[in-house]
From Swiss-Prot:
Main location: membrane
This protein's UniProt keywords: Calcium, Calcium channel, Calcium transport, Cell membrane, Disulfide bond, Glycoprotein, Ion channel, Ion transport, Membrane, Transmembrane, Transmembrane helix, Transport, Voltage-gated channel
Gene that specifies this protein: Cacng1
Protein name as it appears in the record: Voltage-dependent calcium channel gamma-1 subunit
Lineage of the species this protein comes from: Eukaryota, Metazoa, Chordata, Craniata, Vertebrata
Glycosylation sites noted in the Swiss-Prot or TrEMBL record: N43, N80
Tissue: Skeletal muscle.
Organism listed in the record: Rattus norvegicus (Rat)
Pfam families per UniProt: Claudin_2
Cellular compartment(s): Cell membrane, Sarcolemma
Subunit structure: Component of a calcium channel complex consisting of a pore-forming alpha subunit (CACNA1S) and the ancillary subunits CACNB1 or CACNB2, CACNG1 and CACNA2D1. The channel complex contains alpha, beta, gamma and delta subunits in a 1:1:1:1 ratio, i.e. it contains either CACNB1 or CACNB2.
Transmembrane segments: 11-29, 110-130, 136-156, 181-205
GO biological process, one term: establishment of localization in cell
MF terms in GO: calcium channel regulator activity; voltage-gated calcium channel activity
Stretches assigned to the Extracellular side: 30-109, 157-180
Length: 223
C-alpha cells in the first residue's frame, strides 16, 4: 500500500474510532429522550423522566413557578431509576410498561449490542491488517464498521418509535418530549461508522490498472 493510501486509511480509522466511542457512550447512557407531562396548575408535582436503552429514570419535582411544563427539571428532585421500566406514575400503566415498552427496549438494546460486536470484530481485523502484507483485512473490517453503523441507526429508529408510542398512549402521563445528547451521540456514531466503513473499503481496494498491459506486466514480474 502506498504512503498516500496508508495516510488516508489511518485518518479514516481515526474517525471510525471516534464513531465507536460515540456509539459506546450512547449505549451505556440514559439520556436518549426526556419525557414530561403537561401541568394544569403551577403548584403540581412534575413527574419527568429520561431514559436510554437499559433503564428509565423518573424524577418528582414540585413546581412553584408559572411554567406548566417541567423541561430542564430532570437533575433536581427525587430520582428513581429502574431497568426496562419505562413508566412509574402508577399501577394503570404497569401492563403497558411490561409488555410493549419492554419489548421495544430489549429490541433496541439487542441491536445496539450487535453494533458494538461488529465494532469489536472490525477493530480486530483493522489491528491485524497492520501486519506484513495483511492489507486485505481492511476490507472485512470496513464491512463490519458499516454493519455496525447500520445496526446503530436501526436501534435509533426503534427507540424513536418507542418514544412515539409512549407519547401517543393513553395509559401514560407523558405528552411532551425531546431527544437528548445520548440520541445525538448515536446518530453521530452512525454517520462516522457507516461513512468511515465505506471510505475504508474504497481506500483498501487495490488500484485498478489504467492500461490493459499493466496487469500482464505485473503477472510476469511475479514469475
Amino acid at each position: 500500500m502506498s504512503q498516500t493510501k496508508t495516510a488516508k486509511v489511518r485518518v479514516t480509522l481515526f474517525f471510525i474510532l471516534a464513531g465507536g466511542v460515540l456509539a459506546m457512550v450512547a449505549v451505556v447512557t440514559d439520556h436518549w429522550a426526556v419525557l414530561s407531562p403537561h401541568l394544569e396548575h403551577h403548584n403540581e408535582t412534575c413527574v419527568a423522566a429520561h431514559f436510554g436503552l437499559w433503564r428509565i429514570c423518573t424524577t418528582w419535582v414540585a413546581m412553584h413557578n408559572q411554567d406548566k411544563n417541567c423541561d430542564g427539571t430532570i437533575p433536581a428532585g427525587e430520582k428513581n431509576c429502574s431497568y426496562f421500566r419505562h413508566f412509574n406514575p402508577g399501577e394503570s400503566s404497569e401492563i403497558f410498561e411490561f409488555t410493549t415498552q419492554k419489548e421495544y427496549s430489549i429490541s433496541a438494546a439487542a441491536i445496539a449490542i450487535f453494533s458494538l460486536g461488529f465494532i469489536i470484530i472490525g477493530s480486530i481485523c483493522a489491528f491485524l491488517s497492520f501486519g506484513n502484507k495483511r492489507d486485505y483485512l481492511l476490507r472485512p473490517a470496513s464491512m463490519f464498521y458499516a454493519f455496525a453503523g447500520l445496526c446503530l441507526i436501526v436501534s435509533v429508529e426503534v427507540m424513536r418509535q418507542s418514544v412515539k408510542r409512549m407519547i401517543d398512549s393513553e395509559d401514560t402521563v407523558w405528552i411532551e418530549y425531546y431527544y437528548s445528547w445520548s440520541f445525538a451521540c448515536a446518530c453521530a456514531g452512525f454517520t462516522l461508522l457507516f461513512l468511515g466503513g465505506l471510505f475504508l473499503l474504497l481506500f483498501s481496494l487495490p488500484r485498478m490498472p489504467q492500461n490493459p498491459w499493466e496487469s500482464c506486466m505485473d503477472t510476469e514480474s511475479e514469475h
